[in-house]
């Protein structure tokens, strides 16, 4: 094994840099191209700031298609509003006639 000059920084050692530049390709060969390609492409790790994709905004003129729903009147209670009272009367009258 060759001795490396101790005055050189580790990233400047011979063989530390690949001979070809990094590409945007995600094939197996390019994912193992160098340490950076392996971590970002192969493992999907990036420590940089993540950009949020914004949805394309609709122009103001497209508000026409959004019709407002008219206010509905408050619905009445379901069923017969005097239902329980009448049913009690019916039960009482049936009970009186069956002695």
Swiss-Prot record:
GO molecular function term, any single one: protein serine/threonine phosphatase inhibitor activity
Modified-residue entries (N6-acetyllysine), positions: 28, 50-51
Q: Where is this region: Interaction with the host capping enzyme RNGTT?
A: 49-86
Could you mention a single GO BP entry for this protein? symbiont-mediated perturbation of host chromatin organization
Q: Where is this region: Core?
A: 38-48
Q: Where is this region: Disordered?
A: 1-20, 48-99
List every stretch annotated Interaction with human CREBBP. 1-24
Going by the UniProt record, its keywords in alphabetical order are: Acetylation, Activator, AIDS, Apoptosis, Host cytoplasm, Host nucleus, Host-virus interaction, Inhibition of host innate immune response by virus, Inhibition of host interferon signaling pathway by virus, Interferon antiviral system evasion, Isopeptide bond, Metal-binding, Methylation, Modulation of host chromatin by virus, Modulation of host PP1 activity by virus, Phosphoprotein, RNA-binding, Secreted, Transcription, Transcription regulation, Ubl conjugation, Viral immunoevasion, Zinc
Q: Please give the residue ranges the record annotates as the region Cysteine-rich.
A: 22-37
* Modified positions (Asymmetric dimethylarginine) in chain numbering: 52-53
The superkingdom listed in its UniProt entry is: Viruses
What subcellular locations does the record give?
A: Host nucleus, Host nucleolus; Host cytoplasm; Secreted
Pfam families per record? Tat (PF00539)
Residue numbers spanned by region Transactivation: 1-48
Motif span (Nuclear localization signal, RNA-binding (TAR), and protein transduction)? Answer: 49-57
Give me the residues that bind Zn(2+) 2, please: 25, 27, 30
Q: Where is this site: Essential for Tat translocation through the endosomal membrane?
A: 11
Q: Show the ranges annotated as biased composition (Basic and acidic residues).
A: 85-99
Which protein family is it in?
A: Belongs to the lentiviruses Tat family.
The record's comment about this protein's domains reads:
The cell attachment site mediates the interaction with ITGAV/ITGB3 and ITGA5/ITGB1 integrins, leading to vascular cell migration and invasion. This interaction also provides endothelial cells with the adhesion signal they require to grow in response to mitogens.
Further comment found in the protein's record = HIV-1 lineages are divided in three main groups, M (for Major), O (for Outlier), and N (for New, or Non-M, Non-O). The vast majority of strains found worldwide belong to the group M. Group O seems to be endemic to and largely confined to Cameroon and neighboring countries in West Central Africa, where these viruses represent a small minority of HIV-1 strains. The group N is represented by a limited number of isolates from Cameroonian persons. The group M is further subdivided in 9 clades or subtypes (A to D, F to H, J and K).
Subunit structure comment from the entry: Interacts with host CCNT1. Associates with the P-TEFb complex composed at least of Tat, P-TEFb (CDK9 and CCNT1), TAR RNA, RNA Pol II. Recruits the HATs CREBBP, TAF1/TFIID, EP300, PCAF and GCN5L2. Interacts with host KAT5/Tip60; this interaction targets the latter to degradation. Interacts with the host deacetylase SIRT1. Interacts with host capping enzyme RNGTT; this interaction stimulates RNGTT. Binds to host KDR, and to the host integrins ITGAV/ITGB3 and ITGA5/ITGB1. Interacts with host KPNB1/importin beta-1 without previous binding to KPNA1/importin alpha-1. Interacts with EIF2AK2.
Q: What is the name attached to this protein's record?
A: Protein Tat
Source organism: Human immunodeficiency virus type 1 group M subtype F1 (isolate 93BR020)
């Amino acid at each position: 094994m060759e001795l490396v000059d101790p005055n050189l920084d580790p990233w400047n050692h011979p063989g530390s840099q690949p001979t070809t530049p990094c590409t945007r390709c995600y094939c197996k060969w390019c994912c193992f191209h160098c340490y950076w390609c392996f971590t970002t492409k192969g493992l999907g790790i990036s420590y940089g700031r993540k950009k949020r994709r914004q949805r394309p905004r609709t122009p103001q003129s497209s508000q026409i298609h959004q019709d407002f729903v008219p206010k509905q009147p408050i619905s009445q209670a379901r069923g017969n509003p005097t239902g329980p009272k009448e049913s009690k009367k019916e039960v009482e009258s049936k009970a009186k006639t069956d002695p």
